[in-house]
Structure formats: C-alpha cells, structure tokens
Amino acid sequence: MNPKHWGRAVWTIIFIVLSQAGLDGNIEACKRKLYTIVSTLPCPACRRHATIAIEDNNVMSSDDLNYIYYFFIRLFNNLASDPKYAIDVTKVNPL
C-alpha cells in the first residue's frame, strides 16, 4: 500500500504519542505504542525500514524521551518526499 495514502496520518499519530509521553512521562508505554504502530505499517518495505532504523539506533532501549523524539523527527525528514515538508529541528522544543 502506497504511503502517499496513509503516511501523513501515521506520522501525526506517532508525534501525538510522543507528545502524550512528554505530558504523562510514561516512556515505556510510549515505546510500546510506537513499536506497535511501526510493526503494523501497511507497507512491508516501510515496516522493515522503520523497524531496522529503530533497532540500529537502540530506540527501544533508550529511557530518554527526547532521544526517541528526535530519532522520529530525523526518520521523518529522511523519508519526506519533498524537502518543504521536512521538520526544522532548530525550531523544535524538547519534550
């Protein structure tokens, strides 16, 4: 399934989950939700790419919410189809 049809919605959910963890402080629940989202992406190639990136960057073993947050911002920026959609990390406040 083409990410063009579902990508923005999934990225919105990912950043909502991260923001919620910034409010409630439950990093473990956040990581479980994020891993569930990534491991059920409708595109097998996207699922594989995201899962490998999470594993290669030790996201699931991190207790630093901002490390996880900025990881997903970098992942989003790497996958953005057009540079105009990239997130300017200099304008992002830590959670």
Curated annotation (Swiss-Prot):
Q: Where in the cell is it found?
A: Virion membrane; Host cytoplasm
Q: Which residues lie on this side of the membrane: Intravirion?
A: 1-8
Gene Ontology molecular function, alphabetical: thiol oxidase activity
Q: In what residue span(s) does the ERV/ALR sulfhydryl oxidase domain sit?
A: 1-95
Q: Which domain of life is it from?
A: Viruses
Q: Which residues, by range, are in coiled-coil regions?
A: none
Cofactor(s) recorded for this entry are: FAD
Span-the-membrane segments of this chain are 9-25
Reactions catalysed, as given in the entry: 2 R'C(R)SH + O2 = R'C(R)S-S(R)CR' + H2O2
Could you tell me which Pfam families the record lists for this protein? Pox_E10
Q: What is its main location?
A: virion
Q: Does the keyword Magnesium apply?
A: no
Explain the induction of this protein: Expressed in the early phase of the viral replicative cycle.
Gene Ontology CC entries for this record: host cell cytoplasm; membrane; viral envelope; virion membrane
Identify the residue ranges that face the Virion surface compartment according to the record.
26-95
Intrachain S-S bonds: C43-C46
Q: What is its EC number?
A: 1.8.3.2
* Keywords linked to the UniProt accession: Disulfide bond, FAD, Flavoprotein, Host cytoplasm, Late protein, Membrane, Oxidoreductase, Redox-active center, Transmembrane, Transmembrane helix, Viral envelope protein, Virion
- Tell me the subunit arrangement: Interacts with OPG128/A2.5; this interaction involves formation of a transient disulfide-bonded intermediate, allowing disulfide bond transfer.
User: Function, please?
Assistant: FAD-dependent sulfhydryl oxidase that catalyzes disulfide bond formation. The complete pathway for formation of disulfide bonds in intracellular virion membrane proteins sequentially involves thiol-disulfide transfer between OPG072/E10, OPG128/A2.5 and OPG088/G4.
Q: Which family does it belong to?
A: Belongs to the orthopoxvirus OPG072 family.
What protein name applies here? Probable FAD-linked sulfhydryl oxidase OPG072
Q: Which organism is it from?
A: Vaccinia virus (strain Western Reserve) (VACV)
